[in-house]
């Protein structure tokens, strides 16, 4: 029943929610003018450490940072206490598992040059490149995915990894920066 109420609350905030959303705790949502956040069918958003013993440190955060940005989460995807921030576009495929406290972002948040870094006076100084996570990807707990990354379908990224470059489909990747460890034979 609470999930139905939370789905209705998300819809009232402007989130496009397909049927079957399950929530544990309340996610935090930030929409921008002309932006879109969409949740596919049967998504699970776990914002409570009571529902995930891996240690959810904060609620699921779905944030658009600039007008017209998009954040799309595919059908049957489960998220535990992660932050998903889109200045342009973040797209997560179907059947993904995203471990506790992951961060997926398509931007640097601040300018790299010292002038304006603190207050972001010029948004164009902040680097942004779309992020795509294809179907059936598993991101372990505390994984960070940075701007411009594409993760191929059926790939697993080990806990604590920092993904700075795109990864092919069907591999196990780990490390900071994440590197391919091996191919996953049985997919």
Regions found by a protein language model. Give the residues of each.
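C-terminal/domain-terminus segments
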Residues: 148-174, 178
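Acceptor-binding helix/loop patch of EC 2.4 sugar-transfer enzymes
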Residues: 107-121
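A short acidic, glycine-rich active-site loop
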Residues: 61-67, 119-131
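Domain-scale signature associated with acetyltransferase and cell-envelope carbohydrate enzymes
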Residues: 1-109, 134-136, 143-145, 153, ...
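Residue-level signal for alpha-helical context at structural boundaries
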Residues: 57, 114, 173-174
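Charge-rich, low-complexity terminal tails
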Residues: 125-149, 153-154, 159
């Amino acid at each position: 029943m609470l999930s139905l109420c939370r789905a209705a609350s998300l819809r009232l905030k402007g989130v496009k929610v397909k049927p079957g959303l399950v929530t544990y705790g309340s996610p935090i949502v930030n929409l921008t003018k002309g932006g879109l956040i969409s949740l596919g069918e049967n998504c699970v958003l776990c914002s409570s450490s009571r529902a995930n013993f891996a240690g959810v440190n904060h609620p699921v955060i779905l944030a658009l940072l600039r007008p017209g940005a998009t954040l799309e989460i595919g059908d049957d995807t489960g998220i535990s206490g992660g932050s998903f921030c889109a200045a342009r576009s973040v797209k997560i495929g179907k059947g993904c598992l995203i471990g506790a406290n992951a961060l997926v972002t398509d931007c640097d948040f601040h300018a790299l040059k010292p002038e304006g870094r603190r207050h972001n006076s010029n948004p164009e100084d902040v680097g942004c490149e779309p992020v795509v996570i294809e179907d059936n990807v598993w991101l372990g707990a505390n994984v960070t995915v940075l701007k411009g990354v594409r993760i191929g379908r059926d790939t697993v990224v080990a806990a604590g990894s920092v993904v700075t470059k795109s990864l092919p489909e069907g591999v196990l990747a780990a490390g900071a920066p994440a590197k391919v460890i091996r191919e996953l034979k049985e997919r």
